[in-house]
Amino acid sequence: MINPLLELKEVSYKNKNNFTLNKVSLRIKSGEKIALLGKSGAGKTTLISILNGTLKPYKGRVKLFNTEFDKLNLYQKSKISTIWQDLRLIEDLSAEQNVNCGLLAKQSFLFAFKNLLNISSFNKAHQYMQVCNLKKSIFSKNIRKISGGQKQRVAIARSLIQESDILLADEPFNNLDPKLTSNIKNLLLITKNKNKIKVPNTTLISLHRLDLLDGFNRIIGMKNGEILFDLEKTKLKKYHLNKIY
């Protein structure tokens, strides 16, 4: 059996007195395009936070590349990038500086700090911003002065510049119009790269819109901190969805 890229074994997470994840087991293999479904409060954000190491499980084990997460070095952890639902942009920086923050994942803080504000280091950031349909006119603008949809795409470009193997995304299509949603979804689920940039080969994206399921090959449904179904996209039926909505 091929080892998964990322694995949870009987993971539970406790927030105060409540379990927001309850004995969740999950194996993510290379090349999978996974949609994570469930109502607000189902545990999707907690699951993503456990998968990327932001939260430590109350019980259970998390492995990346068959290695316990707490034993990984900085470079190994950088193989996972995340698009957060609340974006987590730095308001005192420009759009291009925020994108460059994605480089923090692979570099020491001192190196990144010295180069973050260096204009000559923005070429790569601009490339990823353009792929995310951001116009040159907003590159140097303070993040406070751009629209919600533009901020969303800055956060996406920041995750892509990290050039990770695995992308975790929490509702990444909020604030995007239908055309941009389609373009960005195709970018995140890409199988043939026409833009000559590195895009993660493996993705897990939480969604609430069922009309966005095209392009995914695996669907996971959550409710009350538990996985109620985990199946191939072709096997998804209405009764599965009725379990979680």
What are the residue ranges of the model-derived segments?
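The feature captures the beta-strand-to-loop junction immediately N-terminal to the Walker
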Residues: 37-39
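ABC ATPase NBD coupling module
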Residues: 68-84, 118, 238
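Conserved ABC ATPase signature
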Residues: 142-146, 150
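Catalytic Walker B motif of ABC-type/P-loop ATPase nucleotide-binding domains
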Residues: 167-171
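Helix N-cap at the start of a conserved alpha-helix in ABC-type nucleotide-binding domains
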Residues: 178-180
